[in-house]
Amino acid sequence: WYLIGYGGDEPLIRQKITEAGMQERVIILGKKNNPYPYMRACDLYVQPSRYEGKAVTVREAQLLGKPVVITNYATSASQLEDGADGVIVPMDNAGCAAGIAALLRDPARMPQLSENCVKRDYLNSAAVEKFYALME
């Protein structure tokens, strides 16, 4: 697993990785000016947030045809269609881990999610039309 990004919890995350003996399996890459090569190479994109407005990185992963797992934060249902172009998992650690594990154990599901991402139109035109309709 590769973690891209940075934040105040990094020391705690490093500690948890060490406590679990996962230093060889979980690599913290830190901030990347160009994360797209990593996203393109990944099998799965996970956004384990407690809150998000509109997570641009979720959409970027979908545009790259990657299955996406996000936690059930307040706006998660607006980010993806659960089971169609991604999966929404519980926000707690155990529920999130169980949701990821279930997806990884299902060999047919990840390719189907990827295919759905590739087929879906993620352009902003539909959102812009809704916005203009609100002003009428």
Where are the predicted features?
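C-terminal alpha-helical cap of glycosyltransferases
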Residues: 124-136
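A short, well-ordered alpha-helix in the C-terminal region of glycosyltransferases
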Residues: 109-123
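Nucleotide-activated donor-binding/catalytic signature segment of Leloir-type glycosyltransferases, i.e.
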Residues: 14-30
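Short acidic/histidine- and often glycine-rich active-site loop of Leloir-type glycosyltransferases
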Residues: 60, 73-83, 87-88
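Glycosyltransferase donor-sugar binding loop
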Residues: 1-12
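Conserved acidic donor-binding segment of nucleotide-sugar-dependent glycosyltransferases
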Residues: 82-83, 87-93, 102-107
